[in-house]
Amino acid sequence: MTSSQSPEYSRFTTGNFSLNEMVTTGNFVIYIVELFFCFIAFPLNIFFIIIIANTTTLHRNLRILLISTCVADAIYAISRYMILIPLLVAYLFNTEISSVTYCWLAKSLHHWVLGASGVTFFVVVMERSLASFLYRSYESESCYQSGFILTGFQWSYGFFIVAINQLDLMGTPQIYPRLPCQIEYSTARAIFVAVVAGAVMNITAVLTFRKVVSFNRTLFRQRSFKLTSLTEIYQISENVKSISLLIPIIVVMIVSNIFSTFTISINVYVYAAVRETPVEQRSAIATHISGRGNEISQVYDLCAIVTKLAFCWGIRAHPDLYKKWCYMFGKVKISPKKGISDTNTTTNLTGLDGKKLTFTVIEETQHHFDSLAQVWK
């Protein structure tokens, strides 16, 4: 690749602009907002990893997928810092601290984890569909290989997108008219493949999600109070709770896709507007439409980092995970009294509100589904 110190690179990079002028004020403001979200997303995903790793209320396959996604989201925040800090330094101090090779590696890492986390909804829905349709045996049988298979697919997909881009990038001119970390190292064909593949998987996931919700609702309404299999009861319970965990994620995904589609539409419009014009006029026309710093395209970056907070928002929808979240920060204090008299047998235990704490099998099942009813509301 062309060195950022070569005269050719400097001539095409700076042009009539100084280094700090290459980053517009609009770029700078959006970068600050994005870094703020990254600053929040990174520790929250780390906390979420700790919570999931220490919970026993989720099936191992679901825990594997959620931890994998949180790792990708945390790395995504790091990759954005790697890309944006050199641009902020250029704006504030008129100094270039990066190189083409550094920014190429940073953006390759960024695209890899973005691709991996982009199929999160798909792999989680696939795992939950297996858990729902195989609820009689999913918990009792060793079905753990599906979690590793889906996780492998998740990361392989992201790497596949990067590999396609690098193959398509070979042979293209290595003259860059912008700062190294402002350059988009992705080709149009690679972006097209990623968009189409992501759209197909998301549509499939949404349709499957609707089927899973319908199936679990039917199962809930046709429940039998003579059910005695604890594994079956547990799996039905976890299916209901995990569905509520997915709802915030799909809401954020839909909103993000709307804004992302808007951004892509602007880029398509720019391309259509300049393709019939002389080469020397294309830059001026594109700048007039999307801004000198291409600020409109940064809407996608903001949408991407907001989706990294989706799982953290999802904690609130999952009763057990939210309880652990509160316990981690001291909002829930459990101080059981020890030394209870032996005369208080387990069959007579009552809570402070006077309600029974122990039940027969039928009473336990009724109490269990009463709790589930609160989740469905």
UniProtKB/Swiss-Prot annotation:
| UniProt keywords, alphabetically | Cell membrane, G-protein coupled receptor, Glycoprotein, Membrane, Receptor, Transducer, Transmembrane, Transmembrane helix
Q: State if Plastid is listed as a keyword.
A: no
Q: Which residues lie on this side of the membrane: Cytoplasmic?
A: 53-73, 126-146, 210-245, 316-377
Entries under InterPro entries matching the protein:
7TM_GPCR_serpentine_rcpt_Srab, GPCR_Rhodpsn_7TM, NRL-GPCR1
Q: What is the lineage of its organism?
A: Eukaryota, Metazoa, Ecdysozoa, Nematoda, Chromadorea
Q: Membrane-crossing residues?
A: 32-52, 74-94, 105-125, 147-167, 189-209, 246-266, 299-315
Main localization category: membrane
Which regions of this chain are Extracellular-facing, per the record's topological domains? 1-31, 95-104, 168-188, 267-298
Q: How does it sit in the membrane?
A: Multi-pass membrane protein
**Name of protein:** Probable G-protein coupled receptor F27E5.5
Say which family it is in: Belongs to the G-protein coupled receptor 1 family.
Tagged with keyword Cell membrane: yes
What Gene Ontology molecular function terms does this protein carry?
G protein-coupled receptor activity
Q: Where in the cell is it found?
A: Cell membrane
Q: Which residues are glycosylated?
A: N16
